[in-house]
Amino acid sequence: MSVVSSVTVKVPGTTANLGPGFDCIGAALTIYNQFQFTRLEESGLIIQATGAEAERVPTDESNLIYQAFAKLYQYIDQPAPGVKIEIELGVPLARGLGSSATAIVAANRLAGEPLSQAQVMALAIAIEGHPDNVVPALLGGCRLAATGASGWEICDVPWHSHIVPVLAIPDFELSTSEARRVLPTEYSRADAIFNTAHLGLLLRGLETGKGEWLRAALQDKLHQPYRQALIPGYDAVNTAAVAAGAYGMVISGAGPTLLALADVSHAAAVEAAMSTAWQEAGITAVVRSLALDTHGAT
């Protein structure tokens, strides 16, 4: 394919971990960022952002979207061209809702698609460091990723149509580095077995929509117990969500966004309860009932 002068990519926000699936499972949601990359005739970088928290977007080479763009050109051993990047933000920054590494989809198209989809995926995972956000953002749906003998093995995780993701996005940030810092360097065998068993139960619960399995499955001993203290109001929001009928609540990615899963018949009540709980805790938050995005980056 020939080199093009401008490309636009729409990328869904993602939620990762889903409780016990630490660093290996994620789902694409119906909330989006849009990136337009236009090749400049001369060297240089122009970054313009609109939408949610646009004023906080870096407009120099420290911008993570630009860094992902440049990484692709480095990978194919070509100098990155001058580029204008227009960002339409629908997914707030630093909230545990996705990865800027997905910008390499646009970079690949702008370069004439020198990389296959599998190569783009592998490079995005390498940039991000783990697959749980990148994979569903690129492919859509709920995805599980694990390393195989010859690279990443990625499988689709069936998601029952009655399961609604309810997303609660607070107005404060939590850096991934801080969320990683509080994690222990070693875990007990009992905790490892606990998460393995509950991840299996989660996969079957998502497929069948069976409430008993989902209520039990949305537990974790590897990351959430250590990160909850970094999120003001966590306990109150969790209690409110479950009381309103949610199967359970988890931290989305590294946080601070919280995700509840609920049957479609309880989603509205869960959304209202989570909103009220955070409001009573003195924290402004946007709470939305969403759906699974099945297309990924387009």
UniProtKB/Swiss-Prot annotation:
| Broadest EC class assigned to this enzyme | transferase
Q: Which BP terms does GO give this entry?
A: threonine biosynthetic process
Pfam families attached to this UniProt entry: GHMP_kinases_C, GHMP_kinases_N
Asked whether the keyword Amino-acid biosynthesis is assigned, the reply is: yes
The question of whether Nuclease is a record keyword is answered with no
Residues recorded as binding ATP, renumbered to this chain, are: 92-102
Show the catalytic activity.
Answer: L-homoserine + ATP = O-phospho-L-homoserine + ADP + H(+)
Source organism superkingdom: Bacteria
Arranged from A to Z, the UniProt key words for this protein are:
Amino-acid biosynthesis, ATP-binding, Cytoplasm, Kinase, Nucleotide-binding, Threonine biosynthesis, Transferase
Entry coiled-coil feature ranges: none
User: Would you tell me the protein name for this molecule?
Assistant: Homoserine kinase
**Species, as recorded:** Nostoc sp. (strain PCC 7120 / SAG 25.82 / UTEX 2576)
